[in-house]
């Protein structure tokens, strides 16, 4: 798992607003890091890393919520988390179904065909959701 960007220059005398800006900027930088994995497709590791970074950003937003003006951003981050969660779930399901199809007994082609059909349906959903993420 990627480590969060260290936030330097904060101390006990740091003004809360300044600390919030620095911490939120660091967490946002972490969200931007895996974007390269979304350029030509959506790779599973980039989805995972972005989900982790968004979870950290959202936690920071919740900490600084009393400063005001962050609820809208927090809702947007939550929507991104949900969208990435849907894609991640489909990646995991498709990988599991691939493994199950490979293990299906060769003398039971109906089972293998059923698993493959289910996997293909998941992959069709995945394509649409990945396109939305790249948009």
Where are each of the predicted segments found?
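Cationic, histidine-enriched alpha-helical/coil surfaces that engage anionic ligands
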Residues: 1-135
